[in-house]
Amino acid sequence: MINLQEQISLFKIIGSQLKNKVECIAIGGSAMMFYGAKNATKDVDMVFSKKEDLEDVKNILYKSGFDERNNIKGIFREDETAGKPTMMDGKDTRFDLFLNEVIGFQIHKDTIERIKEVHDFGNFTVKTASPEDILMMKACTERERDRDDAAELVRKFNIDWNAVINESSKQTKIGIAAFPVLLYDFLTELRENFNVDIPKNITKELLLIAEKRLEELKKQDKLIKVTKYK
């Protein structure tokens, strides 16, 4: 685990060693610490838009004592092609470096437009994803601590639920087709098990979006039948 000041120190090291300007988006606990919504985090999660930028940061972490984890245990809901991170293990924390998507959640211009803060560390610019985007990304994982983080996000911030609904609809076309169902299950769990105030009209709307997308895929004959054998 590292706290905000320790994270800032690591970002300063990266910025001082980069030869060119590199930008990324902080998500998860890393972004939540910048927002003051979390005191410490186990993972520093970052999304890059360029492969070469990710590799530059990865190489600096390697030279700073981090090792790449080759055997990534699945935290993926949909399939093994969902945006896997490059994981760099350190003594007190782990960097998860994503490229353009987070476990199937696609990063695009609307995600960037919703960014709330920008932190400059020399050649390293770290932008913080919006609380709405952090919440939606956490719906794509199966880690229990992500439920705790998501509950804190909803309690601390005035979530723009219209943005969540609009993004959920968009993700069905550019990311995971079943994303509204994942988010519905996730938010329902937060409401029932974490006593979080999730508007019922929002979860209802998510199901309607999912049903609409399912009908579209049926008409286009793009549904895939999956049979599981035990």
Language-model region placement:
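Compositionally biased terminal segments of proteins
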Residues: 1-230
